[in-house]
Amino acid sequence: MTIAIGKSSEEPKGIFDTMDDWLRRDRFVFVGWSGLLLFPCAYFSLGGWLTGTTFVTSWYTHGLASSYLEGCNFLTAAVSTPANSMAHSLLLLWGPEAQGDFTRWCQLGGLWTFIALHGAFALIGFMLRQFELARSVQLRPYNAIAFSGPISVFVSVFLIYPLGQSGWFFAPSFGVAAIFRFILFFQGFHNWTLNPFHMMGVAGVLGAALLCAIHGATVENTLFEDGDGANTFRAFNPTQSEETYSMVTANRFWSQIFGIAFSNKRWLHFFMLFVPVTGLWMSAIGVVGLALNLRAYDFVSQEIRASEDPEFETFYTKNILLNEGIRAWMAAQDQPHENLVFPEEVLPRGNAL
């Protein structure tokens, strides 16, 4: 038996290679280079939200109770946006507003900017994670591309929209009821439901739900019965080489139902990707438009006729009056610092009243 003693021919690894080996090692929870962005940002944003909804009041920013400590529940608690007077300040803890005082920072709404910015980078980190893993296992990057839809909506609603307005104050607060209030605000001040980009977004999301239901049902309906298991989940070997369901039978079924059907699996699944992602992108584009105060559809001729003819009213003119009511009530309540007072005679009345 011969033993060779000598120097290894392998060169010592540099710091980058050492980090790369550790970060991309196969483990239960993959870390990766993207994890350096994802995990800290996700931890801080989620931790900030849990802290804010548990302990922090919105009395100084909105005149509201918004924490569990004040008696709110899961649906009514929120981390509210900074006060309108803070404009677009990043509200850094060490900045001129809070001056290192954590309590003051929370009172001014610093947790909102903390959560929004860390949340945005966490979402971007999650998309990069999908890119990184796809590259590692030699997949195409469509998962990451699809996730750009939710990212675009988050960034447009929580960051770009308030940047186009007078301050972070007009962004949504992080809470269930707070988001509902923001939706009413969007309708009243921007007539959002009549915006074509919102219509495309609704068509994309609901259309995707329909496609998902149809696709799942069709696959279940056309499974090959070649297994001996008791149910769908046990009848097939996960490493089987043959097709699990009959595309030919599915095509024949839907051809009879609609007169047209997908005959290509690749086109079918690309379409299921395309519909929701495009819908989300269109919604995000629409919100960017609202940041610039672009108008939705206006049917002024109907409004003029409704104002002149007491017997003429359409669903559109009724909605316009409803929007005026939302603005009249919401502006005074949401912006008490403006001291808005609307006399009774200027509040909107429909022709029916």
Curated annotation (Swiss-Prot):
EC number: 1.10.3.9
Chain residues that bind pheophytin a: Q130, N143
The keyword RNA-binding is assigned to this record: no
Cofactor note: The D1/D2 heterodimer binds P680, chlorophylls that are the primary electron donor of PSII, and subsequent electron acceptors. It shares a non-heme iron and each subunit binds pheophytin, quinone, additional chlorophylls, carotenoids and lipids. There is also a Cl(-1) ion associated with D1 and D2, which is required for oxygen evolution. The PSII complex binds additional chlorophylls, carotenoids and specific lipids.
Membrane topology: Multi-pass membrane protein
UniProt keywords, alphabetically: Acetylation, Chlorophyll, Chloroplast, Chromophore, Electron transport, Iron, Magnesium, Membrane, Metal-binding, Oxidoreductase, Phosphoprotein, Photosynthesis, Photosystem II, Plastid, Thylakoid, Transmembrane, Transmembrane helix, Transport
Residues the entry annotates as binding a plastoquinone: H215, F262
InterPro entries in the record: D1/D2, Photo_II_D1/D2_sf, Photo_RC_L/M, Photo_RC_L/M_CS, PSII_PsbD/D2
Parts of the chain that traverse the membrane: 41-61, 125-141, 153-166, 208-228, 279-295
Major localisation: plastid
Compartment(s) where it occurs, according to its Swiss-Prot or TrEMBL record: Plastid, Chloroplast thylakoid membrane
Superkingdom classification of source: Eukaryota
Additional free-text comment from the UniProt record: 2 of the reaction center chlorophylls (ChlD1 and ChlD2) are entirely coordinated by water.
Family as reported in the entry's similarity comment: Belongs to the reaction center PufL/M/PsbA/D family.
NCBIfam families: psbD (TIGR01152)
Protein name according to UniProt: Photosystem II D2 protein
The species this protein was found in: Chara vulgaris (Common stonewort)
